[in-house]
Amino acid sequence: MCSRRGLLPVYAVLVSLWFFAAASTGCARLPYTTSVVHEDRRVIVSLQRDPDAVPYTHPVQLNADELSAVLAGFSFREKQRLPLRWFAEEVPPKKLLRSDEMEAVVPFLVEGLAKAAPDERVYFQVLAPGMNPAAERDTTAGWIAVREPFLHVVLEHYHAQFPIRKSEQWDLRYPATPPEPKTYLLYFEPGRFWETDPTTKRQAVQFREFLKTAIPASRQ
């Protein structure tokens, strides 16, 4: 009986160390910001290091017309479970970005792709006043990256309401915790350029081939 009691503290220490190691490993593998490309009241574009990513072919040279043409082909639906998925499929997918949002963010995405390292992705936030402008900010956010010949786009938030004042994060009455990222199903038109990247098994757009048909050679 005494020996069992003596082992209890040892087990407790081992379990604590296991949880600490697991938590430390999980945190270390999260993407983190390495530099801010641009920040104003309308858009924030930054570079994030992605420890788990297969190296991208960054830096990449694209102009604003080219990237705008590619992003204009994207639409999405929020991923739903059954039976909500049946109803969601009846609604046409939404465009990834409106034209005014594209004009605001694309120049800085182009700059980000030109500066990104192979282990970095370009993260963006498009901002607007929230439902309660004094406390919230409307945020559409995601990231883009290039692994030739594919351009990857991930949407994490779509017009989500983000708290403005970070100082209230631990106020239980008015928590300022940002919403969790959602999962979205992305589509691209024309569909023949929407393929699976064999390196990651994720869908992406064959953007070089698409641009040959979307933009005249004189403008490329």
Regions found by a protein language model. Give the residues of each.
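Bacterial Sec signal peptide processing site at the extreme N-terminus
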Residues: 19-45
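Polybasic, proline/glycine-rich intrinsically disordered low-complexity segments
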Residues: 158-219
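Envelope-exposed proteins and targeting segments
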Residues: 120, 138-142, 147-151, 168-170, ...
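Early exported N-terminus immediately downstream of N-terminal targeting peptides
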Residues: 47-103
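Sec/Tat-exported extracytoplasmic proteins
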Residues: 71-78, 109-120, 155
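Mid-length scaffold segments of soluble, non-membrane domains
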Residues: 98, 102-138, 142-148
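A mature extracytoplasmic/lumenal domain signature
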Residues: 49, 126-130, 140, 150, ...
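Sec-dependent bacterial lipoprotein signal peptides
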Residues: 1-25
